[in-house]
Amino acid sequence: MIRRHIWWILLIACLALGLLWPRLGHRDQVIPVPCQDIVAGCALSPAGLRVRFDRQPDALQRFKVYVELPNVPEVHASFNMRGMEMGFNRYRLLTDGAGRWQGEVMLPACIQGRKDWLMMVEADGVRYEIPFNSR
């Protein structure tokens, strides 16, 4: 009887570990990218990253994001603010096959009226954090 209880405990422990493993595993590396003018473009030379917008973004208005990042299979972009999650807004950017990625995106509305945004560009297990301001 005790042996049976031990097997159940081990089974439950294995299931719990399986469910928690993704949260315990490796965290994506976050690299800050300094950016003065997101429309002119911002770059991080060692990674080969360059990011720019087609215009100064405004909440709930579509704009284009352009990312240059060679040798990665996928690029995703999302938008948040420091200390404030802005809901699910993750975009998969499309490539031209030469390390250039683009997508049409939209900033969520901030009910506090803040304009200080963080764009997260995710590629190949690395997250690049790019600060910018909206109108």
State each model region's role:
Residues V72, A98, Q112-D116:
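Extracellular Ig-like/FN3 beta-sandwich strand-entry sites
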Residues A109-F132:
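Short, exposed beta-strand-loop hairpins at the edges of beta-sheets
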